[in-house]
Amino acid sequence: NEKAAQAAGIAYDKVVLFPASHAAYYPGAQSMAMKVLYEKKSLRLLGAQIVGGDGVDKRIDVLATAIRAKMTALELTELDLSYAPPYSSAKDPVNMAGFMIEDLESGKVQQFHWNDVEDLPCDGSATLLDVRTEGEYRRGHLNGFRNIPLDDLREHLDELERDKPVYVNCQTGLRSYLACRLLTQYGFSCSHLSGGYSFYQVVTQEQQTARSAYPCGMEKL
C-alpha cells in the first residue's frame, strides 16, 4: 500500500477507478473501487486495493499474480482475460487500470489527487472546473469549482482562459478524463482529479471521522 511504499522510499504513483463487475448492459453489475500503485521509474506494479462485492476476488488474484511475476503496469493492457457479459467486460477492469497508467506515462493526461485539492490556487490564477451534471453539482461539490457539464463544455470553451491551468473534477474520474482530452486538443493545460468527487468525499470523511473518534468508534469529547 501507499504507506509501505513511502516507508521504503519508493517514488510511486497510483490510479483510482470505479469499474463495473461485469458488462454494464447486463443486469446485476456492481461497482467496485480500485486503486493500483506502480513505481514511477520502472513502472513495476507495487500493489492494489479493491473495495466492492462481486468480482473483487478475481481482480485481486490477477493483480497479485502480475506483481509476483514482476510485470510492469503497462503489461496489464495486454492481458487476455476470460470474458462473458455476466462475468466481465470486453476490457477487464485490470486492463483499464493499465490503460490509465499508460495514458499518464505517455503524457496524454495529467492527474492530481484528493490530498492536492486544498493546495489548488483559488486566487483566479487557475480554472477549477466541475464537469458533472447540474444535479450532481448541487448535491455537493468542491469549493471554488465552477460547473460546466461535460456535454456543454464545447459551447463554453470561449469562457475559459487558455493561459491558465485547468483542474477538472467529476464524480469518478471518467468524465474529467474526457474533458481533459478535449481541453488539451484545444490548447489548454489540464489535470483531472484521480477518483473524482466520490473518492475525495469518502477519503476526507474517513479522515474527519478518524480525527474525531477513538479507534473503537467512540467520539472524542
Outline where the language-model segments fall.
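A short, polar/charged loop-to-alpha-helix boundary motif
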Residues: G53-A73
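Anionic group-transfer/hydrolysis microenvironments
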Residues: L37, R132-E134
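Mid-to-C-terminal Rossmann-like scaffold of FAD/NAD(P)H-dependent oxidoreductases
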Residues: N1-G53, P85-S89, P93-D119
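Active-site flanking residues adjacent to catalytic metal/cofactor-binding acidic residues
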Residues: L129
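Residue-level recognition of short, well-ordered coil/turn positions
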Residues: I10, K70-M71, S125
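Rhodanese-like catalytic fold shared by cysteine-dependent sulfurtransferases
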Residues: L74-A126, E134-Y167, Q171-L221
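Residue-level marker for well-ordered alpha-helical positions
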Residues: N1-K3, I60-D61, Y177
